[in-house]
Amino acid sequence: MGVERIQAAFENGKKAFIPYVMGGDGGLEILKERIRFLDEAGASIVEIGIPFSDPVADGPTIQRAGKRALDSGVTVKGIFQALIEARKEVQIPFVLMTYLNPVLAFGKERFIENCMEAGVDGIIVPDLPYEEQDIIAPLLREANIALIPLVTVTSPIERIKKITSESEGFVYAVTVAGVTGVRQNFKDEIHSYLEKVKSHTHLPVVAGFGISTKEHVEEMVTICDGVVVGSKVIELLENEKREEICEFIQATKQKEEA
């Protein structure tokens, strides 16, 4: 399915709620169970993090989750195996969030073959500059897996247009300067930034980094096509507050109907 499965998540004006889970945090059985739960709860896409020892874009919550996964001996191969098994039970799109180093260490051809086998539909590589994306972009295109671009508040318009014109899946619009993590509120300029990104791409635009309340979700999906919620989802899963994740999903769907 690949790119088409991601596109379907945004069809007919659907607003996407994209939770992030760290692969192997709590074990690989837990990863499969969390994917099943998020699918049943109505999430649009699930973003799965590949743990890495130097996660430069991650805030403290995601860093701790990655460290727990690495400390428990979780491997990239193990995560792929868990995704292969999860894919037999769910049709929700899988998007991997991985730094470039684990891809190259695993072998980029082998990594993408494993993605295909596991039914991965898209990949986000936060430390891969646009100018260097040919390291993996042609292989991903051949495999029908979306290389999802990140744009930031400081990205000039021309750069946004260039990055998004060659991309597939959706555009990940980073809503804060700095790392991921829970924020209390967003500055007014974020609204004009998201509108600017939307006006310069044919792809759905998803807001991410720092989204941690239902109010944030409601605010963001009035402007763009969906949200990624990472640190907050990890906290809620860790504290067994799953009903709050369902409330986030409901907040997204309500805006869809508005």
From Swiss-Prot:
Q: In which pathway does it act?
A: Amino-acid biosynthesis; L-tryptophan biosynthesis; L-tryptophan from chorismate: step 5/5
Q: Supply the EC number(s).
A: 4.2.1.20
Q: Which reaction does it catalyse?
A: (1S,2R)-1-C-(indol-3-yl)glycerol 3-phosphate + L-serine = D-glyceraldehyde 3-phosphate + L-tryptophan + H2O
Q: Which PROSITE patterns match?
A: TRP_SYNTHASE_ALPHA
One of the entry's Gene Ontology molecular-function terms is: tryptophan synthase activity
Q: Where is the active site?
A: 47, 58
Can you list the GO cellular component terms from the UniProt entry? cytosol
Record keywords, A-Z: Amino-acid biosynthesis, Aromatic amino acid biosynthesis, Lyase, Tryptophan biosynthesis
InterPro entries in the record, alphabetically? Aldolase_TIM, RibuloseP-bd_barrel, Trp_synthase_alpha_AS, Trp_synthase_suA
Query: SUPFAM superfamilies in the record, alphabetically?
Result: Ribulose-phoshate binding barrel
EC primary class:
lyase
* Gene3D superfamilies linked: Aldolase class I
- What does the sequence similarity comment in the record state about its family? Belongs to the TrpA family.
Which proteins does it associate with, and in what oligomeric form? Tetramer of two alpha and two beta chains.
Task of the protein: The alpha subunit is responsible for the aldol cleavage of indoleglycerol phosphate to indole and glyceraldehyde 3-phosphate.
Name-wise, this protein is Tryptophan synthase alpha chain
Q: Which organism is it from?
A: Bacillus cereus (strain ZK / E33L)
